[in-house]
């Protein structure tokens, strides 16, 4: 079935950091693909803003080369590329110099803007320290209209205090309903499907609690190193970069109560309640229930790779590239159910998944049949493939057949072979529509930091040194110990 996307209203899409890595890899390809599918209005313009000394033609040449690198060849159409490039403008601005922003205003109010540009999307694809100054300069230049939106990339700050400072600075210019704090994990089809699976099927909800669920695992593993992001990453680490935002947002969708409606406020209200119910970790619990690691040299696939310290050119760096945490939620539904979270770079393979493992049957009923009865698991794969599968026990055909685990699976690519928008494509169109349902609200961000920041502080107080793990493995040995001491094991990975 061919699904035609609903067109969005004309807008000016302004990307601060328009020549950066995020714009080249994610934002501009996503906007091109929405143009390819006819979702961008004819008058929509895309304005790159950066310090680079480019004019419109130079920027278009740069973006053309970027599309060739980052868009699948069969999705590149020369006519669409030309149409897309014709939308582009470039403004050379020193983002730290407020007076430079007058040039942005000149482009926004230029005659080629037409009359349909009340909607202005300001995408801040730059360092969080610039969020406040950029918004302040936009406000001072009178460029923020009632229909404007601002998009903030994670992480929002380095800790609770800096997150609050950013939120205050941005909130002084934009109303909360205009602020879109993006987490691209929430735009993944399988993450959204989790809500439908939970709340659209009557059989699952009675099982979704501590009486039936043994534990939950949330994993985001990457096989790549830090690459060009070394300067940023060495000041952040895995907890700030991934766990405090991506993994906690996924945890919220797994653990939240049914919202009154699936709308912009109800879903976010329930996510906030989960974050506020996370049990704070004491110094002793942090020592016992968290693991940090840093990758050393090793073999990823067939490639010999160097260590993290070699990549960031700092032989003494103590930044964690791996973190695992055992967390608990203090409410009736989840009391006693551990949530195991882990994320790392230079792991054995790239995959992200949610594993909900159910408790075993109370009494084995088939002692005379060979084979094993594995626990039931609901596995939601987020990447590289998006899929949902239910693992259960079945008997092989024949009299005396063995017991073995089987899967009931929904693979999105197989079930829906037509191409669907990726996470950034979906979320960018939600921004233009003004729908913040899948974006983080201020209170969510600050609640997440309120839980995560003490962990960072306990590590610092204990002078925690990340354990080295070989690149191409599943992290430090301590990560396996964290879950195996509870009689459980990690799902996925090289094992």
From Swiss-Prot:
What GO terms in the biological process aspect are recorded for it? Answer: glucose metabolic process; pentose-phosphate shunt, oxidative branch
Instruction: Give the EC number(s) under which this enzyme is classified.
Output: 1.1.1.49
For this chain, the family text in UniProt reads:
Belongs to the glucose-6-phosphate dehydrogenase family.
Q: Which GO terms describe its molecular function?
A: glucose-6-phosphate dehydrogenase activity; NADP binding
Q: Any idea which positions bind NADP(+)?
A: 94-95, 154
Q: List the disulfide bonds.
A: none
Q: Which UniProt keywords apply?
A: Carbohydrate metabolism, Glucose metabolism, Isopeptide bond, NADP, Oxidoreductase, Ubl conjugation
Which enzyme type, at the first EC level? oxidoreductase
The record, for NCBIfam families, names: zwf
Covalent cross-link Isoglutamyl lysine isopeptide (Lys-Gln) (interchain with Q-Cter in protein Pup), where: 51
List ligand-binding residues for substrate. Answer: 184, 188, 222, 241, 345
Q: Sorted alphabetically, which HAMAP family does this protein's record hold?
A: G6PD
Job description of the protein: Catalyzes the oxidation of glucose 6-phosphate to 6-phosphogluconolactone.
CC per GO annotation: cytosol
Recorded superkingdom: Bacteria
InterPro entries annotated for this entry? G6P_DH (IPR001282), G6P_DH_AS (IPR019796), G6P_DH_C (IPR022675), G6P_DH_NAD-bd (IPR022674), NAD(P)-bd_dom_sf (IPR036291)
* Keyword check for NADP: yes
Q: Which PROSITE patterns match?
A: G6P_DEHYDROGENASE (PS00069)
Q: Which residues form the active site?
A: 246 (proton acceptor)
Q: What is the designated name of this protein?
A: Glucose-6-phosphate 1-dehydrogenase
Which reaction is this enzyme known to catalyze?
A: D-glucose 6-phosphate + NADP(+) = 6-phospho-D-glucono-1,5-lactone + NADPH + H(+)
